[in-house]
Amino acid sequence: MLMNYSTLFKDNAKVAQVGIIGANGGFGYSFLAQVPRMQDSLSLRVICDLDMDVSRKLLESLKYDSSRFHPCRNQRDIEQALKTDDPIIILEDGTLLPFCKIDVLVEATGSPEVSSVMAQACLKQGIHVCMVSKEADCVSGPYLYNLAKQHNCVYAIAAGDQPANLIQLLSWVKMLGLEIIACGKSSEYDFVYDLETGVFEFQGQTAVLPDLADHWHLDGMQTLKQRSRILSDFPQFAVPDYCEMNVVSNATGLKPSCDRFHYPVCRVEELADIYIPVEDGGVLTKTGVVDVFNNLRRPDEASFAGGVFVIVRCHDEKVWSLLRAKGHVVSRNGKYACMYLPYHFMGVEAPLSVVNAFRLGLSTYDACTHQAIMLATAERDFKQGERMDLRGHHRLLDDVHVQLLSAQDAPVDAAPYYLIAGRTLTKDVRKGQTITIDMLDLDGSELERMYREGKNA
């Protein structure tokens, strides 16, 4: 998991010419802020977003040299820009990316169709792709992974987000020969509770909940039920969690623990007593699974929001007793332990994926196949002709419920959640129905073709 990067790259000092599309979001900003700090490894060649002026102002705010900026609207403009010294090409049209002589594309638009099409175009030209848009990856990732192999380049999910961090942690655990019982992540935002005042806080919302103090310490699974009940006015699941665990499942073969995840409200030190088999007092009816929890902490404790974890079986009583004495998270019965990374640093970490792809030909993945699918179920009656648009920062479909099923348990014709995005319904959908591919106008959808080919690969 940890390595000496100076040693790893000591015989390879090549500088990657990198492009980014979808640059004006949080991930894109953090990545662009990091690139100038890594001049021995990376050079920004292209920034692509919907508004050139916004992109230019973003680069200026990050102190990029404006003399390098070249707004380009066609291939001829790009050819002229490439004749200059160390240009930064500013695009609005992503179809021009393959002509910009980049080594690696960082794809961060968050648009499933656009992300997949842009990645495909670059991979076909031998350009490595680091995918930030998990909404695309969980649908087209297997296809793009295979396409990259065909063109002798790398397709990777970008470091700095939970899927890549968890995949990396899992690879470390597997290398150590430890048995994986469960793995997962914390949901995006912490549940913060002050035991002295009884004040609960979540995303700026507060409530006085004195009863929660009575269930602060874990006393069997009944404690989890009581916490969930007390916090019923606050959201205890999020669609992006399902998407991220879909990515992890496809990359590792680990299956969803259950259709809607357990989402316990719990503390990090409790994980090894919760994500264990039912017969040992936990929540799992099967092992080798992915899941999500809501992190409960005091105001004076560090955040775990967006952190990742793996539960392993303790293989030797003496070893794990020693580790428990050092403060590591070991279950009360001594049979299970939790290993975790309590962070994800977004674009600060993402350059490692770029450098690994360019210098070493390494991907986050060692496999990528359709192991799970996000099912979308109508929460109201929909009419033929309604358009299913994503909304908000978290890329949600209105009035649609999500589940994550293993591919073998899902209906054969089920439409992945993010394949539905931006599509028009071709027929009425009743409340409670699973949205299927034949209910969508997919005429001309490259994403649908990639999904189909990825399933059949």
Could you tell me what each predicted segment is?
Residues 128-130:
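A short hydrophobic/small-residue beta-strand
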Residues 114-121, 125, 134-153, 158:
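Rossmann-fold NAD(P)-binding glycine/threonine-rich loop
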Residues 50, 110, 134-137, 160-161, ...:
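Short, ordered loop/turn segments at secondary-structure junctions
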Residues 54, 136-145, 162-166, 187-191, ...:
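Short gly/pro/ser/thr-enriched loop/turn and capping motifs at secondary-structure boundaries
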Residues 2-10, 206-457:
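C-terminal catalytic/substrate-binding lobe primarily of soluble NAD(P)-dependent oxidoreductases
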Residues 59-60, 141-144, 167-170, 191-197, ...:
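Short acidic, glycine/serine/threonine-rich loops at helix termini
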Residues 1-121:
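N-terminal glycine-/serine-/threonine-rich beta1-alpha1-beta2 phosphate-ribose binding loop
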